[in-house]
Amino acid sequence: NAENKDEFKSMSVVMCRFGGDEGAEVLALLTTREVYIVEGKRRQLVYLPTSPVPMSGGLVFVAEDAISPVPGMDADDLMKIYFSLGALMPEDGEGGLPRAARSNIADASD
């Protein structure tokens, strides 16, 4: 229904960091700006899509300081990335995403 679609589009795209500075970063949707206290710690509720069916993801409480906004990217852009298994990434540096590394893996193995 249209109301659910509007709620989905109002979610903010964020990058969630798991495992500290050397860990992994995952594109996700911040479902609400509300902060929840879980076991005495500040958490926010994010939706972690999965690929290639983003709607089969899950809701996770993530530490507030492990969430960074991704300016210039909306929920539709995020879903395109997940549906395409990453093939439809924004141009380098667009949408707040890091630039792609310019290396040829095949050359590196020679």
Where are these regions (language model features)?
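Terminal membrane-proximal soluble interaction domains of membrane-associated proteins
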Residues: 6-110
